[in-house]
Amino acid sequence: MIEKMKVVHIVAAASEKTALLDRLRTLGIVHFGEKASADQRHLERFAQLSRMDMALQEYAGPGRETAPMSDKDFEPFYKELADCLERRKTLQEKKTAAGAAAEKLTEWGDFSPEELRELKDQGFDIHVYRTDKKTMAALAADPDVKIIRLAPVGKMPTLAAIGPLPGTYPVTEFPIPDKGAGQLRRERDDCDQGLRSCQAFLTEAAKHLPSIHDQMLKTQNAAEYSSVSNTSQSQDGLVWLTGYIPEAEAEGFKKAAAQAHWAWAMEDPAADDDKVPTKVKYNKVTRLMIPVFDILGVVPGYREYDISFWFLGFFTLFFAMIIGDAGYGCLFLLAALVMTLKSKKASTAVQLLWLLSIATIVWGALTGTWFGLEQAMDVPLLRSLVIPTFANYPAHFGVESTTQQNTIMKFCFILGTVQLSLACVMNIRRKFREKDLSWLADLGWLAAIDALYFVVLYLVIGQQVNLMPVACVVIAGFLLVVLFGGMSPDKSFGQGLKAGLGDAFTVFLNTISAFGNIMSYIRLFAVGMASLAIAQSFNNMALGFKGPLVIAAVLILLIGHGLNIVMGLLSVVVHGVRLNLLEFSGQLGMEWAGIAYDPFKKHDKIKK
């Protein structure tokens, strides 16, 4: 359930601003929509602490401090760590530059540029060139040019000359570097020594990661405090703030305001207010979806639906059908058991894993799929659990493979039709209560979707369908959508009718899209079959190894089924989540563009 929110305006004496902010943070129920930027010093410090945290992760070991350092003790450590990281960066850049320069000089051998500069100071302006054999011969024959032949560099004749050569000769001059190869190598070695020193310090500093995390949290809280402080407005000795609170917290706010002697006003959010935060109230069942929503980073809009219950139900079924193997479900169940025993209390994510594991085992048992092994059907108990027309090995039950595939595909289309029809019913219910005539358009969509289901069966499965009544229902649904799709409480009947007729072509395209939406649920069948085929392929590969090569067979099974599980989990994200977030949510008209309710309070965890 999405909790109702109230807009609250809070006014206090300007001299009480700090007390106001402190009390609001302690209260922890007011959400501020448009906040000003936090003080730059807090933002810069948090960014630096984040960089330190990332840098020290690679040095983190088992031994860590038992308690964070005090603020006073942390500051010298913070400065020393910042200096060390800056020094490490400089040394790495210097080492890279020295290595690259030394690499370029490798073919020139080890020489001292300093000695060449000393010769130049004594009047010997030496220039080094590379050229071809013909030019080298011409230079040697020129009485006006004095050259010294050097060893070839890069298979090209090389020479030294006193003073620059005339521009008439095609030669490439070698610029004398500031440092020789030997000096550069020594410089690189010095950098390595400095980096080892930095590494030793960072290894020791990694033990203080808890202190860094503690300071990150404090800095983040300070940044939020300064942001709210900067958001407040003041005039004539008064300071005021505007935010949102859950309606259920209104009485608690009023008591706190009376104790603090604040002036306040409370009202419902305006109809066009798009900054209202969304606070979803979960029950014991729907809270299982929190980890999924957190991973996806989606929040329903304040005026949208809370579909967490339906999302959980369909997501669980989609997960089971996509993974499709009871053996894999047993592995997930074992993982859930281990995590539960290890933590002694199952987190929400682990509870969700329990549910998904059991659902996968049930679906796999109904289809007779156990690690892709056909031999599992020789076990009477496992065989007795199978629904024959759902069986992935239909020959064991006297069912033709075409019949089995058509049954699964039909089940997928039924799921799609039920889910999309549910969305229409939810829209009808809400709009009917709001006296919004566009509920008739959703009734039209309901009729069209249910009729299009039979069209899908006719085209995909080849089921005999009387298309004339189906076409009539689709046309009737189309007309209802066109006539009433533009209606809304703030429009007259004529205005709504005009808007609906103007969108007739769009409705036509959306009707075709509705057909495609039902068709898209076939992905559950396709991905499940692909997963089974992959499992069978690896099983057959492993069967080819016997005797001493049985170890190779075990490796093939572990790697093959491991990859299949990973691909299945990715498919759940790509396909299972998509059907909920796009097809189902699209039919509901949800955009998932909500703003998560984030009240002003002192957090005990770092916000990402």
Task: Report the location of each language-model feature.
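Conserved, carboxylate-rich catalytic/transport cores that coordinate ions
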Residues: 1-6, 18-32, 251-608
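Long, charged N-terminal accessory/stalk domains
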Residues: 1-310, 339, 346-350
